[in-house]
Amino acid sequence: MVGAGPAALRAAIACADSGTSPLLIDASGVGSASGAHSIAGIAASIDELDSSAHREDTISAGGESTDKISAARVCGEGVATLAELERWGLVLRTREGGLPHAYSAPGHSVDRMTGCGDSTTREVTRILEEQAIKRGIQRWADTYLYGWQ
């Protein structure tokens, strides 16, 4: 995987869990997550019967360029992904009863954003880095791939 942000880390974890030996290559040092952009939160259909409204909001916000199959898959996996991160140690802001606090965000017709406040990106990256370490995923830091576009 090229990069060390949340997407690359999660992809490497999936590879390791399926029996392959992934390698993370990043131009910055370990822990820098140079490719990680700040995120407002994690969207999941936690207060909905299913993810169909989430999928429709995503398709509506993305317009004609939206891959409907990908939108359905990603929106459908939101709750399971959030639960996985919690099992691995992510501490979400919660509401009474212990469920994740959900709030509104542009493009969503209902409250479905959740997270760790301003530290969501940092905390998700930290959790995924811990999981990568537990799996012995090799990392090359301070490495540049010349000619890579």
Predicted regions: what is each one?
Residues 1-24:
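N-terminal Rossmann-like FAD-binding beta1-loop-alpha1 element of flavoenzymes
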Residues 27-149:
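Conserved N-terminal/central alpha/beta ligand/cofactor-binding core
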